[in-house]
Amino acid sequence: MQLIPLPAFTDNYIWMVHDERHALVVDPGDAQPVLEALQQLGLQLETILVTHHHPDHTGGVAALRAATGAQVFGPAREPMPEPLIRLTGDQQLQALGLNFQVIDVPGHTACHIAYFCADVDGAPLLFCGDTLFSAGCGRLFEGSPAQMLASLDTLAALPDATRVCCAHEYTLSNLKFACAVEPVNQALTDYTVKAEALRSQQQPTLPSSILLERQINPFLRTRQATVTQAVQAFDASARDEVSIFAALRQWKNQF
């Protein structure tokens, strides 16, 4: 199986998984990059996975379905065009012979879902949409801080080796904020150098890994003393886990 990030718009990635003949894509906000890749690689699109309803994740679905006849899977309780196979957490689906577990991850939107496969060529794979980014997380447009914190806790508990396929190339801006929050984090400092080198060569910083994100991502590290103290310096009223997370997200919004 091959895993490819297809760039779209300014900073989106449409993730494609394919074998020698067939493909699936995740969150195709634009049909054109997918159609070009299918033609170039000689592939048939079988499956479209959607994590949430925002247009930059769904805008290409109708054209791709019309062109290829692909099945479309997406969140059961979000406004999505039919025909759609609607999914909720703890359901499973099979695509390209791979078994995906659906995980409810509300926060960015009210009913956002993620797709986790325990074994793709020997390593787990996560498509997390706009819930988890490298060194960051999605804005809370519909969900609450408590929901997003719980969603991130769920993803952080996945196996260390899980490849994290985020939907946006936000890594450098997220790292700038993360370094402001936790300047003493050597793993964060080291990874910033690596990520800057990748981007200077127009290379993606993704996929990340769950292990790396637990080491560098302040939104997965809100219980670490260094992060807690930094957040409380920003907002002294932040005391419990949820208010600390909420204050951290607000800090990032203003950064």
Swiss-Prot record:
* SMART domains listed in its UniProt record: Lactamase_B
Q: Which GO terms describe its molecular function?
A: hydroxyacylglutathione hydrolase activity; metal ion binding
Q: What is its EC number?
A: 3.1.2.6
The cofactor note from the UniProt entry for this protein is: Binds 2 Zn(2+) ions per subunit.
Q: Which gene encodes it?
A: gloB
Question: What is the protein named?
Answer: Hydroxyacylglutathione hydrolase
Organism of origin: Albidiferax ferrireducens (strain ATCC BAA-621 / DSM 15236 / T118) (Rhodoferax ferrireducens)
Q: Which domain of life is it from?
A: Bacteria
What are the required cofactors?
Answer: Zn(2+)
